From Swiss-Prot:
Protein name (record): DNA-directed RNA polymerase subunit alpha
Recorded family membership: Belongs to the RNA polymerase alpha chain family.
Keyword Flavoprotein: no
One of the record's GO cellular component terms: DNA-directed RNA polymerase complex
This protein's encoding gene: rpoA
Signal peptide range: none
Residue segments, region Alpha C-terminal domain (alpha-CTD): 243-331
Organism encoding this protein: Bifidobacterium longum (strain NCC 2705)
Protein task: DNA-dependent RNA polymerase catalyzes the transcription of DNA into RNA using the four ribonucleoside triphosphates as substrates.
Length: 331
């Protein structure tokens, strides 16, 4: 069986609701195959919760107004569609909003049952005057994708129940691009960059994980045709060479002198793990980084039980004969 190199997936968090995922290296052509499948699944098949119908006290249908309420019922329904929900229940549940007196009615004024969470409590629903009263009963259900109000209408609905367009999908935007990446001497491998933006109801990381789980289940149907059929096997995940948690500690924690610290940061060395991957000669090649700085770094690392990377060409400058060793700090 052919064995392909296992791709790696990394996440770059741009904000709590947007992340950029990079998957590489992929066999030529698989960037578009995987990217298109993930995008379509993320936009259409991630489960979520939404309001499916409402009952508004004093309103028999959406083409009416309420006394003491600035917005008409149609505008109130549009605002209700903007409520972002999560629900632990597979069956429909009910929540209520009761508001009176002058002020703004927002999603945070709704009283949801246990297991239902409103992710954007600041969502505006209506504006009430001094004599305004607003009482709404919401029906919340779980689903996928988008369901128009007509499909949420039931034949046995009581008079006054108004169906609402349901936007179940917790994913707002998905885009991807494919770039070339290099593996040894080959430069035709794919690098997939997937940009995902979600509602507060779910994180981009969980959304991508859900999409991946869905695709695995669906593609597994094809494998069931012949479980012994030969395909391309993905190699094992690479084993990390260093699992010491101190490798991720920033070099600021070493309390180096300002000169040494500035030299390392200018060279792009930000963590202890990056520092110990360099040899003494690597550091000496940094401008204004001399033996005093080397000794300081070695002393700080020694307190952590660490050391710089050894070099086969290392030599002891203290034993040089017939010459004088010069470092920038001797200036």
């Amino acid at each position: 069986m052919l064995i392909a190199q296992r791709p790696t997936l990394t996440e770059e968090s741009l904000n709590p609701q947007r992340s950029r995922f990079t998957i590489e290296p992929l066999e030529p052509g698989f960037g578009y195959t995987l990217g298109n499948s993930l995008r379509r699944t993320l936009l259409s098949s991630i489960p979520g919760a939404a309001v499916t119908s409402v009952r508004i006290s004093g309103a028999l249908h959406e083409f009416t107004t309420l006394p003491g309420v600035q917005e008409d019922v149609t505008e109130i329904l549009l605002n209700i569609k903007g409520i972002v929900l999560t629900s632990e229940y597979d069956e429909p549940v009910v929540m209520y909003l009761r508001k009176s007196g002058k002020g703004e009615a927002v999603a945070g004024d709704i009283t949801p049952p246990a297991g239902v969470t409103i992710a954007n409590p600041e969502q505006h629903i209506a504006t009430l005057a001094d004599d305004g009263e607003l009482e709404i009963e919401f029906t919340v259900e779980r689903g996928r994708g988008y369901v128009p109000a007509q499909m949420n209408k039931q034949d046995n609905d009581e008079i006054g129940r108004i169906p609402v367009d349901s936007i179940y999908s917790p994913v707002l935007k998905v885009s991807y691009k494919v770039e070339a990446t290099r593996v040894e001497q080959r430069t035709d491998f794919d690098k997939l960059i997937l940009d995902v933006e979600t509602k507060p109801a779910i994180s981009p990381r969980d959304a991508v994980a859900s999409a991946g789980s869905t695709l695995v289940e669906l593609f597994g149907l094809c494998r069931e045709l012949n479980a012994q059929a030969e395909g391309v096997e993905v190699g094992p995940a690479p084993v990390a060479e260093e699992t010491n948690p101190e490798m991720a500690v920033p070099i600021e924690d070493l309390n180096l002198t300002q000169r040494s610290y500035n030299c390392l940061k200018r060279e792009g060395i930000h963590t202890i793990g990056e520092l110990v991957s360099h040899t003494e000669q690597d550091l000496l090649d940094i401008r204004n980084f001399g033996m005093k700085s080397i000794d300081e770094v070695k002393e700080k690392l020694q307190t952590l039980g660490l050391s710089l990377k050894s070099s086969p060409m290392a030599f002891d400058t203290n034993n040089l004969e017939g010459g004088t060793f010069f470092s920038p700090e001797d200036e």
